[in-house]
Amino acid sequence: MAKKIKTARAIEANAGIQQKFKKKLLTFSRAFSTEIVKAILLDLADNGLLAQDRSLTNPKNPQDKRTLQEISKMVLAKWSRNPEFFKDHVEQFIAQHLGSWIAKATPQARKIAEWVARSTAADVTASQRQAYVAAGLPLDFMAEKWTVPVVRQRISQKAADELPSIIEWSTNLITKMAVNDVQRLQDVIVSTLADGKNITSMRKLLGVTSGFDADRARRVAIDQTNKIANGILRANDFSLGITEGIWVHVPGRFSSRETHKAMNGKRFDLAKGMFDPAVNRFVSCAELPFCRCVYRPALNFSQLLKTK
């Protein structure tokens, strides 16, 4: 009879961090979109009627509302004279300024990425430590290996070394998601003018057709935190000498990968991952898009404590 493998419990990303991350993503995306729409509309009006500190996207006082009506008439008049030229002008304006918009947005995206990476690293490490103590590993065993301070916790040097690349990866994804919404903004502006509607209608349509909606932000938040969590957990495990795990399939919200269902309960090399025939390569937990799978670390006490 095969000897039963001793394991610690699997660790999942923190739902509270995922929720906060979702809100940060929505706030960032909406602010980015608002700035771009304002810049486009100001350009369409030749900056002649609106001061830079007034809001075209959300006018509050009577003066701004009157100015908006005047600009609406001006923009529609220009559009009616030469729609194709006007459309090309919008496209060229976006192409010319997209780089500067990205440069302006990137520091805020990086700030969010740093927060989610460090918060997730600290949270999963705390849970990981508790799981190992409950499984019977001495607390000082982790204390000797996890020495780098991160948000009131200490993680392994290997995990700390991976944080910069995690932050860079997350920053790029956050920025890219906002940039991908620029095409939607352009399409709404052009189609609204083509239909002869005013800027007030345009603002309403932009709000209704929000590209980065709450559900998409939730999916992105879950996916990114799962990937970050599993990366940190593996790095911490490697520092302890833990090299194998038991795959735990976590069902998706609407569906599950059949190959990952088949992986459930199987032992695998943490460094190598497990072979997934659906993609014809080895994968780690949470590596594929929207995969929520985790693992239970396999514990060989005699081997681990021998290297202590």
PLM feature spans:
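N-terminal leader/targeting and assembly helices and adjacent pre-domain segments
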Residues: 1-212, 299-308
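Acidic, glycine-rich two-metal-ion catalytic cores of nucleic acid-processing enzymes
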Residues: 211-308
